[in-house]
């Protein structure tokens, strides 16, 4: 900052010497009046910059007013150029360059705000030639597309009828700003970015939106600009989730992904999908009477001499089995007899596997009955065969050789 101040002071002193020694002739007042811009440098009228950017008045000699003090008085009649055009043009261009430097760095003690820097760096003449600066995604600048669902580009127009009043809000939605002009002339750089439909609607003399007292939303986005028809949003959608439902209505509306909540208005969101009642099948209830009846019929068919009562009585008082009885059960003669009875075992096993509780009851009853039958020597041979058959049922219909060897 100190180096810039020293350089500007030196240039200012050199400009004063050049201005005092310059011998300029009479000059036409029309060509050098305080117009909107001088040459193509992008310098605009000082009063407009002061009005728009609210910059305080600087002393004479640091602004463009020193240029008019340097120039001599103007003849009232038709003036003619008496001085050399080349030297005068070079003097004027050097004055303009030095004045622009002093004007930008004169208030360097208090740095200008962000708005002033941005507005001074973009002029009307240069803005029309080059593309406007658009910030990319970073921590400070966020693109508009990320938050379009919540804030969007919608601007509530005022009912005064002047469309220029809505421009600052629109500039905020585009994340860039232009110098706010005191007059109602549209900035050319902003006009160049907008589609043709929006600019033609701006310059039209009679607009239907200006006469309506209620404010209507103006849809503003990078893809397309459309004025929605005035009908209220649907009651099922909240304004936070669906900013403008009308933006997607019509042929030229914006394309929106199907996962957005505005596309799912017909469906109920947040409600659990329950299965229909037809799919629930009642589980079969356990019929204990039928199970006991099956048990009695099974015992009567397998061993005709032993009924269900005898089986339960023998289960109540089981005598301890001796080693000789176990050896007699495990003899190969009994195994040979068991092979003869195996086709009937399959039939009874199929009946047993239908009910798990019946299997458990049969298992408990089978534990007691063979012990009593093998313990009595006076019983006939078929009682021992029946008891061996029940031992086979206890093993699941197949002979477990490892269990026999272990016994």
From Swiss-Prot:
Natural source organism: Oryzias latipes
Record carries keyword Ribonucleoprotein: no
Function field: Acts as a regulator of Wnt signaling pathway by regulating beta-catenin (ctnnb1) nuclear localization.
Pfam families registered for this protein in UniProt: FAM53
Keywords: Nucleus, Wnt signaling pathway
Region of interest (Disordered), residue spans: 204-286, 306-380
Biased composition (Basic and acidic residues): 264-281, 327-339
GO biological process, one term: positive regulation of canonical Wnt signaling pathway
Protein known as: Protein FAM53B
Superkingdom per UniProt: Eukaryota
Gene: fam53b
Tissue-by-tissue expression: Predominantly expressed in proliferating cells throughout embryonic development.
Keyword DNA repair: no
Assembly description: Interacts with ctnnb1.
